[in-house]
Curated annotation (Swiss-Prot):
It comes from Prochlorococcus marinus (strain NATL2A). It catalyses: tRNA(Pro) + L-proline + ATP = L-prolyl-tRNA(Pro) + AMP + diphosphate. This is Proline--tRNA ligase. Homodimer. Belongs to the class-II aminoacyl-tRNA synthetase family. ProS type 1 subfamily. Pfam families: HGTP_anticodon (PF03129), tRNA-synt_2b (PF00587), tRNA_edit (PF04073). The gene is proS. GO terms for biological process: prolyl-tRNA aminoacylation. It is found in: Cytoplasm.
């Protein structure tokens, strides 16, 4: 390919809409063009990158016996309603684009394909003898992101690889899950990425277990917690840990104390010489579920800990057997709208009376009461007395016996001790999710009644796994991890071109002829090569080459008449003056090929 025919359009200035460096460089390098918020055109340079990533993915999955397919992007609402996900994906903060056809039938524009593939497999696979099977596709997905940002990191239209496996039993699922994890490790290694695999929350996809593959980057949206021995890692949404023992509050006669205007943990401790770990703080949440009901929730946790909203939402879903569409802390405005005026925020205890909800217009009339393990382990504690400016002291759970659920809803944090080894502590880093694998179990096969005949001749539900890779996101994540002040530094395996040849002076015949000879030789040997044949100053060509990040640069310059060229490595920044045989030998060694 010649630059004069590439439609290359580079920018010197940082685009105003780009917040992180990878987004800035993709725009400046002419890799993407923004159409509107969260929607981008993949320009020819990026399309070559995406095709190389896709090729690596397809090659690796084929070695695992996966079959490639292409599923419909338009999906009928009926199958999503049967799985119980239609409301959670289209209401509240749901991310599915939905529409109606001419007949008034509701359709969704596929953000994911669990329902579709489950229905198809149930109509196609009938016996355990046909299992296991693993099917994948690579296609455009659509998600109505509330806040699309960071370019391809969180866009409303993107390219994704999603695979779905079907099994006769759990052991077979776990075997394939392990194989797919290995395949993902191979894929991301071949793409030249530094990554970690961590435990993750399954979110709206669901299932018993899941893991995320994260590219480590300071700009990552996700906080990852990793043990100091690297034997445990998890997204903070999922992470578990052992907290340090707090300061003991010696048991004494339970009593009520006056605490005027001491609404916060800090105020309460500063005025009374308490320690946050001696306090049970209680927060009031409101959970909206897909049964259209709103459930008030009282959550108790040790005063020096924070609530993990993801864990809390999951526990409420399990308790109610409903999907939680939205969960948030109840505000004074919420109370006023419900006609409730006497809940003393800042002084709430775990035993706040359900009678206060009798006045509510649209909420359920009883609190769901949940206590984190950190609070339930306290033998003597301080908590609100449900009256303004009053707290209880030296109370225990025998005196306040109102909790329905005791579980882990605490947010693990850096410095906490590790579950697998108490001598190890959690450390934090930030990451960009590029892959996610799930053990779905029978979640979808049961809801969609997808069955097969097992070895005993009995109808049984499929065991399922699903496995996603964000192809377009991976491309930008690679840039986030591989760049410098001059521009992108693509890993060779996914670079749009492996080599760029620059003619320093297009009017110099020696330089043109030498560059053309090298160009034809590399094409003959199937090297992905770009020839900068523009009538531009050499400095502009060098800046563009650095910006777009081609791994190797050959410059036909002043020494061309002597048959010498400069060979420059974009990553190491090492430049050598070599004859052509030495150039071809060097590149052959780098590309592990016998040609050149």
């Amino acid at each position: 390919m010649r630059v004069s025919r590439l439609m290359l359009n580079t920018l010197r200035d940082v685009p105003a809409e780009a917040d992180i460096i990878s987004h800035q460089l993709l725009v400046r390098g002419g890799y993407v063009k923004r159409l509107t918020g969260g929607i981008y055109a993949y320009m020819p340079l990026l399309w070559k990158v995406l095709k190389k990533i896709t090729s690596i993915v397809e090659e690796e999955l084929s070695t695992k016996g996966c079959l490639q397919t292409l599923l419909p992007q338009l999906q009928p609402s009926e199958i999503w309603e049967r799985s119980g996900r239609w409301k959670s994906y289209t209401k509240g903060e749901g991310i599915m684009f939905s529409l109606k056809d001419r007949q008034g039938k509701e359709l969704g524009l596929g953000p994911t394909h669990e329902e579709v593939i489950t229905q198809i497999i149930s109509q196609t696979i009938h016996s355990y003898k046909q299992l296991p099977i693993n099917i994948f596709q690579i296609q455009t997905k659509f998600r109505d992101e509330i806040r699309p940002r960071f370019g391809l990191m969180r866009s409303r239209e993107f390219i994704m690889k999603d695979a779905y496996s079907f099994h006769a039993n759990e052991n077979d699922l776990q075997s394939t899950y392990s194989d797919m994890r290995n395949a993902y490790e191979n894929i991301f290694t071949k793409c030249g990425l530094d990554f970690v695999c961590v435990d993750a929350d399954s979110g709206a996809i669901g299932g018993a277990a899941s893991q995320e593959f994260m590219v480590t980057a300071e700009s990552g949206e996700d906080l990852i917690l990793i043990s100091s021995d690297s034997k445990y890692g998890a997204n903070q949404e999922k992470a578990v840990s052992i907290i340090e023992e707090g300061k003991l509050l010696e048991p004494n006669k339970p009593s009520i104390i006056k605490t005027p205007n001491q609404k916060t943990i800090d105020e309460l401790c500063n005025y009374n010489d308490f320690h946050p770990s001696q306090i049970v703080k209680v927060l009031a949440y409101l959970a909206t579920c897909d049964d259209n009901k709103k459930y008030p929730v009282l959550v108790s946790i040790r005063g020096d800990q924070e609530i993990n909203d993801i864990k809390l939402s999951n526990k409420i879903s399990q308790e109610l057997k409903q999907n939680v569409l939205d969960i948030r802390i109840i505000s004074n405005e919420d109370m006023q709208k419900q006609g409730i005026s006497n809940i003393p925020f800042g002084f709430i205890g775990p035993d706040l009376s359900d009678n206060l909800l009798a006045q509510s217009k649209a909420w359920e009339k009883k609190f769901i009461r949940i206590a984190d393990n950190s609070a339930k382990d306290l033998k003597s504690f301080i908590c609100g007395n449900n009256i303004k400016d009053e707290h209880k002291i030296f109370y225990n759970w025998n005196l306040i016996n109102t909790v329905q659920m005791i579980c882990d809803i605490r947010k693990a944090k850096p410095g906490d001790r590790c579950i697998h080894d108490k001598t190890q502590k959690l450390q934090e880093c930030r990451g960009i999710e590029i892959g996610h694998i799930f053990q779905l179990g029978t979640k979808y096969s049961k809801s969609l009644n997808a069955t097969f005949t097992n070895e005993k001749g009995v109808e049984d539900h499929f065991w399922m796994g699903c496995y996603g890779i964000g192809i377009s996101r991976l491309a930008q994540a690679a840039v986030e991890q591989n760049h410098d002040d001059l521009g992108i530094i693509w890993p060779t395996s996914i670079a749009p071109f492996t080599v760029i040849i620059i003619i320093a002076n297009i009017k110099n015949n020696d330089q043109k002829c030498l560059a053309e000879d090298i160009y034809q030789k590399l094409i003959q040997d199937r090297v992905d090569v770009l020839l900068d044949d523009r009538d531009e100053r050499a400095g502009i060509k060098f800046k563009d080459a650095d910006l777009i990040g081609i791994p190797w640069r050959i410059v036909a310059g002043r020494e061309a008449s002597s048959g010498l060229v400069e060979l420059h490595n974009r990553k190491t920044k090492i430049t050598e003056l070599l004859d052509l045989n030495s150039v071809f030998k060097k590149l052959s060694e780098e590309f592990n090929t016998e040609k050149l």
